[in-house]
Amino acid sequence: MTSAPLIAFTDVSKSFDGGAVKAVDDVSLDVAEGEFLAIVGGSGSGKTTLLRLANRLIEADSGSITVEGEDISSIDPIGLRRRIGYVFQSGGLFPHISVAGNIGITPKLLGTPEAEISARVDELLDLVRLDRAQYRDRLPHELSGGQRQRVGVARALAARPRIVLMDEPFGALDPLTRDALGDDFRELHRSLGLTTVMITHDMTEAILLADRVAVMRSGRLLAQGTPAELSKSDDAYVGELLRTPRRQAKRLGALLPRDGAP
C-alpha cells in the first residue's frame, strides 16, 4: 500500500496583477516522505511561487495543498512556517543578530528553554561544519557567503522539521563552495530523514542532488520523474534542459585530461 505524500499540490493555481499573470497554472505534484525533489525552470516559470504557496507565504487562488496530511488552509500560517525549514538564496539572516541568535530564533519563538536552545545551536554548528568557538558569536557580515548559507541551513533545521524548502540555496555561491555545500546538504537530508524541496534553475545541480526532478515553464508543470524518466520526455523544453549538462560534460571531457594523465 502506497503511503500518502508528505506534501501534495492538487490543481493549484496562483495569479497576480488581477489575473493578468498566471504564475502557477493548475499544478498537481506530490512529494513523498524522505524524498529530495528539485523543481527546475527559468525565470518566470512559477517554481518559487509554488514553493512559497507550500508554507502560505502567499495564498493559492484555487486548488488544495496538504502538508503532513493536513490541508494548509486550515492551519495557522505562522504555526505552519515554524514546523517547516526554509533556506533562502542569500541565507536570509538577521544582520544584527549573532550566528547563535539566528540559528536559535525559531526554537525561541516556540518557547524552548534557553539551555536547550544553546545545546541545539552547538549541535547544529557541528552538523554544518562550523567551529562553535570561532563562529557562534559572529555577526552575518563577518561570514563568507558559504558560511552564511551554512548558518541558514542550520537555522532551517533548528526546530527539527520533517520538511525543508530551499529557494535557490546555492545559486549565489562560487563553484567550489556550491559543490561542497550541495554534497553536505544531501548527506544531511539522508542522515536526518528529511523531505526536501529545492528550487533551482540549474538542471545539472538538480540531477546531481535530487531523487526526482519536476520541470516548470510559464506556470505549468511540464514533466516530473527521475533523470532517466525525464530523458524519455517528448517535451522540447525538457529535452533542451537535459541536453545542456550533457553538452557541458562532453566539452569538459574533451578539454580536461583524465586524473593522472599528462
What does each of the following model-derived ranges do?
Residues 55:
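Helix-to-loop junction immediately C-terminal to a conserved catalytic motif
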Residues 71-85, 109, 230-233:
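ABC ATPase NBD coupling module
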Residues 115-134, 187:
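Conserved ABC ATPase "signature" region
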Residues 138-143, 147:
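Conserved ABC ATPase signature
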Residues 218-219:
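Conserved ABC ATPase "signature" C-loop
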Residues 224-225:
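ABC ATPase "signature
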